[in-house]
Amino acid sequence: MTAVAIALLASDFITKQIALTHFSGTDPTSTLGGLLKFTLVFNSGGAFSIGEGETWFFTTVKMLVIVVMLVVSPRIRTPLWAVSFGLVIAGAAGNLIDRLFRDPAPWEGRVVDWIQLPHWPVFNLADCGVVCGSALVMWASMRGIRLDGTRATEEPAEPGTTERTAEAKNQ
């Protein structure tokens, strides 16, 4: 979980700095025949610019999501849940850093978005982490995979181990 989070958070930070340096004050840069564009947008709202101007709300929500996931994360015993939590935590943290430290003021900062696909709002790597990590969480939940790796139909692991009980193994 930690390695995934660090890799995404670092990638998000570096790519935002590149976007600020190379795309500021320029027209969108097209690549792949116009399929992918790089354009700099400062987003004061949530995903897809919903709730524009409610930065304090999104800042608070992101902080709560990170805290809850960090509190729950010690129970994770599978790579699937570790990767999904790492992606969501890093994505939320990447955009939270923008909200806390970018203009116009602390807690009111705008998120740096710079990736644009046709018929889609501009986004960044942190957004990709939140979306992909959330999709993995939903997929694992729908399949009944618990944080400890057991299925909802199995008995959970013994406390302090990753091994299922003998009864669950024999079923």
Which role does the model predict for each range below?
Residues 1-171:
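Alpha-helical transmembrane bundles and membrane-interface segments of multipass inner-membrane proteins
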